[in-house]
Amino acid sequence: MPEDDTFIVYRYLIRLLKEYPCDTVVLHQISRGPFAPSISQYVMKLETYLRFAKIPYMNVHGSQKSKKGKYPWIEYNGQELSDTEFIIEFLNETFKIDLDEKFTAKERGAARAFQKMLEENTFWAVTLDRWLYDSKSSGFRLIGVPSWIIFFLRRNVKNTTYAHGIGRHSPEEVYHILDRDLQSLSDFIGTNKFLLGDEPCQEDCAVFGQLSQIYWHSFGNKCNTYLKKYDNLCNYCERMKERFWPDWEQCITKGMTQKATK
């Protein structure tokens, strides 16, 4: 039997063994994080969206990736989707949701531009800071990655970021890129409670997903130092946490000292 067919049969058998509730989003993600509910920006983005949109969902924690080799991913009434943007588009259409309906087209455009800046640019600076520049591999060790695997993961980060382009820069240049992104976001938010004003928009989920890793999961590296220059961004993180994660303490491992209960 070809390898692809074997994989399909395996996934089918797994689904037979697991019956999920109808009309409930099944969110597949890795295990809970030390100080924020996930070490993945995109898990934080998607789960915050589900809470914001008040969509019924359940978590399945594990290492199983989607057919595209990505996580997080979801199942909904037997249908599998991956990539947070496609997932959110699907759920908006399925549940007839528009979290941005109160905002103008100009505001929506600005919000998406900042989302893309953070996801396509800032993300890579944080990746280098967290997983490559730290010679002690603090992040890897805190989440329990075996020492012999760390070498291969760091090499993968180095190769991926080099191919992207940002990995060709010096650490000083990368931190300069990071700081300019954060300053731009800080200037735009100003005294707003959320990205576009006193109420959150859909893009706040993505912004929070990215900032949450700098604020809670820098593991003592430099990214957090840059973020703390901007009080309004730190306050923003706390505000998003309070608004959408009242059960935060139940969703973290507190530095791997306890098991998350949700």
Task: Give the ranges of each region predicted by the language model.
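C-terminal helix/juxtamembrane-tail motif
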Residues: 2, 234-262
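Structured alpha-helical bundle/scaffold domains in large eukaryotic membrane-trafficking regulators
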Residues: 58, 222-226, 248-256
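Acidic carboxylate-rich catalytic motifs and surrounding loops in phosphoryl-/glycosyl-chemistry enzymes
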Residues: 59-65, 198-200, 252-256
